[in-house]
Amino acid sequence: MNREISVVDYHHEVLTAWAALRKKLSFPPAVWTLDYHTDTMPCFRGAMPPPLPGAWADENTVADAVRTLRHDEHFDWALRAGIISEAFIGICGDDNQITAHEAMHVVRPADFPGSDVILNSPEKFRPQAEQMLSSSFLAALFPRLPAENEIYILDIDCDYILCRNALYPADDRLIQQLVQNAALITLSRENDWVKILKLPGETITGTEVASIIATWR
């Protein structure tokens, strides 16, 4: 199927595009996500009840969810509603050991420093930050990658990119493969978080990151 790209301001807003893709399929696809940090919160911790299976079919229900959800609660909502089957979430910030749903898999490199080092001693972290889209890094990060001909979503929160050089790894075969074979790519600008988390001296913005990735073919 033809690849689609959706660019939003905030991560939870990707739910709209995920639900639209689900309507075209007879099954829920898996999603592979890259994010600085994932909250893994249950979608119903606020005033919103958990969705019923199949809630993705009603546009008003999805729109209400987007208005109500915050942070990364959309993962739990999408799993409970049957929009996606699994979520493989690669992060570089501190890991959450407990997730809101058993099909939500948060993964982080074992040798990564904690957020205290990333934020307080960023130059020590720069060599790793520059490799976070490299083929070797992504292959080691995810417990599994999409199978050949698998229909899936590639989801990138732009605050995962902490420096401009990260967008240009020497070996970009795997990220390009993930981009080219995805049924849907969702990009969250998250400009405020990119501004907070980017390494010193970097001028990259979430809008720029999303624009660059959206041109990859």
Task: List the predicted regions and their residue ranges.
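Long, hydrophobic, well-ordered secondary-structure blocks that form the structural core
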Residues: 31-41
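Catalytic cores of soluble, metal-dependent hydrolases
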Residues: 1-31, 44, 48, 53, ...
